[in-house]
């Protein structure tokens, strides 16, 4: 006699004729789509509005802020009606906008209709012009810093590195057979890496050698190739490579470099990129198994963490890393050569929980490795627990930077130098650990971000025109329906 048993698959009950019980039940295959879309509604849209912050006119007199948003819970048509009428299943999106006139001190606040927002069905699809469509998730390269290697004709190892964000300009490092390290900024013409180091603050040859080590042959070779000699010349040379044909000035170059890498509106590592960056550039895995070339002292307490000549195990390396130590000199050995010192430099991020008595993730929202210099400022400012919590919340974006930092760039160059000595590892970029799924919520967020950046330019121009006409300026007149709908419509 055939035994039939009921099997629950989501909301559906099916009858199974199998003799062997299932080990794992059928997963909810549309859960990823629905969870991603819900994240976009609850957090993704908020991040887009937060990135915009305030829109100022060219004179700095008028400021438009997006305070809040809400989605109407009652769509115009049901799913069935949308299919019958060839309509789009959507709900109105309303945004509360506040206009501040600095000259008169007048504040106007209005709720503005920004267009129809596409809604997801229970099946994880969208209804567009009566047709049911699904947004396919993308498998993309994860943001972070990744290292590779190749060999030249003589069999010499040539190391490369790529620092790619979720959104923004790329940094690509490469070396040639003459031991010169080059860098490409945003896929432009290459220049010696020391030129970029000068532009970021290491002005003289002595400062660069002192920071990375006097006896690093690739730093010395890059310095010989470098035609600049100080920070100003470095900034001008970087600007010439990025903007050929334009007259370079120190101010323009500094502003352009800041916009490329340190402006959150133009550069974004995202949370996963920051995690990968911190994990790669930390000290722990790079100093474990080596002997300390000098005493290692905790910067906050003055405690001796490792004595000169002591071999550092993994537990000790993790303790050193989380104590806020950013530079460790270790001894590296090569066959037939005497041990020589090598400076290992981290990006200065630590586990914040080690420095506070309360749960920093639950009570202050610090859920990633945080910048040690900022933690130290907070500890020096106050010892009161409640004040520390408040300062952690206020400085969250500085503690966990979504952009690349100068320390990240310095540490990435140091990691590249260490590969020559067998310190660190190269990455397999096709490994799934270095890939991530970009699902529907993030794709929608990126589309809205593009739309808002276009709309921002139109609003700024409208501010200037209406200000010159001396007419009544309201948030509604600046953000009218045709403008917002044209730029925010998701294709």
Question: What kind of region is each of these model predictions?
Answer:
Residues 1-488:
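N-terminal non-catalytic structural scaffold regions of very large proteins
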């Amino acid at each position: 006699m055939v035994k039939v048993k009921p099997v629950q698959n989501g909301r559906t009950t099916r009858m199974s004729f199998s003799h062997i019980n299932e080990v794992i039940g059928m997963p909810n295959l549309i859960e990823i789509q629905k969870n991603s879309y819900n994240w976009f509604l609850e957090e993704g849209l908020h991040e887009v509005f937060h990135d915009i912050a305030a829109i100022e006119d060219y004179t700095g007199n008028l400021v438009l802020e997006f305070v809040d948003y809400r989605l109407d819970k009652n769509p115009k048509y049901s799913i069935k009606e949308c299919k019958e009428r060839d309509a789009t299943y959507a709900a109105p999106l309303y945004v509360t906008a506040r206009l501040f006139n600095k000259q008169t001190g007048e504040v106007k606040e209005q709720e503005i209709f920004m267009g129809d927002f596409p809604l997801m069905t229970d099946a994880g699809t969208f209804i567009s012009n009566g047709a049911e469509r699904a947004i396919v998730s993308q498998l993309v390269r994860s943001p972070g810093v990744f290292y590779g290697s190749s060999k030249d004709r003589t069999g010499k190892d040539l190391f490369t590195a790529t620092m790619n964000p979720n959104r923004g300009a790329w940094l690509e490092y490469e070396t040639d057979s003459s031991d010169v390290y080059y860098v490409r900024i945003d896929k432009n013409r290459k220049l010696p890496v020391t030129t970029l180091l000068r532009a970021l603050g290491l002005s003289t040859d002595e400062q660069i050698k002192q920071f990375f080590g006097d006896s690093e042959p690739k730093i010395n070779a890059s310095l010989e190739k470098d035609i600049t000699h100080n920070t100003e010349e470095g900034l001008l040379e970087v600007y010439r490579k990025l903007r050929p044909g334009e007259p370079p000035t120190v101010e323009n170059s500094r502003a352009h470099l800041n916009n490329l890498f340190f402006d959150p509106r133009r550069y974004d590592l995202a949370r996963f990129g920051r995690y990968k960056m911190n994990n790669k550039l930390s000290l722990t895995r790079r100093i474990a198994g080596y002997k300390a070339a000098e005493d290692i002292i905790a910067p906050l307490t003055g405690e001796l963490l490792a004595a000169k000549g002591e071999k550092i195990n993994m537990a000790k390396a993790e303790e050193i890393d989380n104590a806020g130590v950013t530079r460790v000199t270790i001894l590296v050995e090569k066959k037939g050569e005497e041990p020589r010192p090598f400076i290992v430099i981290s990006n200065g991020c630590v586990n914040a929980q080690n420095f506070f008595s309360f749960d920093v993730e639950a009570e202050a929202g610090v859920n990633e490795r945080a910048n040690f210099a900022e933690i130290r400022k907070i500890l020096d400012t106050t010892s009161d627990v409640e004040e520390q919590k408040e300062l952690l919340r206020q400085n969250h974006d500085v503690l966990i930077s979504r952009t690349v930092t100068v320390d990240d760039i310095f540490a990435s160059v140091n990691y590249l130098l260490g590969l020559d000595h067998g310190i660190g590892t190269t990455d397999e970029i096709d490994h799934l650990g270095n890939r991530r799924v970009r699902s529907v919520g993030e794709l929608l967020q990126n589309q809205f971000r593009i739309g808002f950046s276009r709309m921002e330019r139109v609003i700024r121009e409208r501010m200037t025109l209406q200000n010159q006409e001396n007419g009544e300026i309201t948030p509604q007149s600046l953000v009218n329906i045709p403008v917002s709908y044209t730029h925010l419509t998701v294709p």
